[in-house]
Amino acid sequence: MNSSVLGKPLLGKGMSESLTGTLDAPFPEYQKPPADPMSVLHNWLERARRVGIREPRALALATADSQGRPSTRIVVISEISDTGVLFSTHAGSQKGRELTENPWASGTLYWRETSQQIILNGQAVRMPDAKADEAWLKRPYATHPMSSVSRQSEELKDVQAMRNAARELAEVQGPLPRPEGYCVFELRLESLEFWGNGEERLHERLRYDRSAEGWKHRRLQP
């Protein structure tokens, strides 16, 4: 059985002077690319789960304001749809405001253990409130109090006052009402790139771009 399935270290093939991954990461889609990149995304995430990647859905999401000034942060992919990936935030946060001004965004999944990357590009669309209600109730209830009292990205003037307000809400049994600004965005993908650490620095890069006729794929030089 391939060592990557068992999560055992495999030195040699995937080693690089600049990358520290030690788990063999199969990339069968590079030789026979499927027509739909979302199936590749599902496959990679499932393999990452099997080999024990610590945070496989931690997406470094880059947004930009109306003047093109970028900002980045980590969000968690909560769901994969047929057209993109979903994550939750607060509408009044910096990313929420920027996505309202400029919906184009780019995200990267980087898995150090296997030296793999997935680059996701597209436009963010705010989902209906019903989706936000669903996402809110899926969160651990212990996260509700602070998420309810916080006005994400606004200046924090009194740490203890905010802590006390959250502790007061924590006395409530069960879920709290969803805060008005809590929302879900879908990053509807226009392109994806799957990157694998290859032999002799011939890294394996498989890119998909959406077109009027559907998805088109091509291999890129390292």
Swiss-Prot record:
Domain of life: Bacteria
Keywords: Antibiotic biosynthesis, Flavoprotein, FMN, Oxidoreductase, Virulence
Catalysed reactions, semicolon-separated: (1R,6R)-1,4,5,5a,6,9-hexahydrophenazine-1,6-dicarboxylate + O2 = (1R,10aS)-1,4,10,10a-tetrahydrophenazine-1,6-dicarboxylate + H2O2; (1R,10aS)-1,4,10,10a-tetrahydrophenazine-1,6-dicarboxylate + O2 = (5aS)-5,5a-dihydrophenazine-1,6-dicarboxylate + H2O2; (1R,10aS)-1,4,10,10a-tetrahydrophenazine-1-carboxylate + O2 = (10aS)-10,10a-dihydrophenazine-1-carboxylate + H2O2; (1R)-1,4,5,10-tetrahydrophenazine-1-carboxylate + O2 = (10aS)-10,10a-dihydrophenazine-1-carboxylate + H2O2
EC number(s) recorded for this UniProt protein: 1.10.3.16
Cofactor: FMN
Top-tier EC class: oxidoreductase
UniProt-recorded Gene Ontology molecular function terms: FMN binding; pyridoxamine phosphate oxidase activity
Binding site for substrate: 18, 90, 139, 147
InterPro entries (alphabetical): Phenazine_biosynth_oxidase (IPR053451), Pyridox_Oxase (IPR000659), Pyridox_Oxase_CS (IPR019740), Pyridox_Oxase_N (IPR011576), Pyridoxamine_oxidase_dimer_C (IPR019576), Split_barrel_FMN-bd (IPR012349)
Cofactor note: Binds 1 FMN per subunit.
Pfam families: PNP_phzG_C, PNPOx_N
Annotated family: Belongs to the pyridoxamine 5'-phosphate oxidase family.
Job description of the protein: Involved in the biosynthesis of the antibiotic phenazine, a nitrogen-containing heterocyclic molecule having important roles in virulence, competition and biological control. Catalyzes several oxidations in the terminal steps of core phenazine biosynthesis. It oxidizes both hexahydrophenazine-1,6-dicarboxylic acid (HHPDC) and tetrahydrophenazine-1-carboxylic acid (THPCA) and thereby contributes to the generation of both phenazine-1,6-dicarboxylic acid (PDC) and phenazine-1-carboxylic acid (PCA).
Protein name per UniProt: Dihydrophenazinedicarboxylate synthase
Organism placement in taxonomy: Bacteria, Pseudomonadati, Pseudomonadota, Gammaproteobacteria, Pseudomonadales
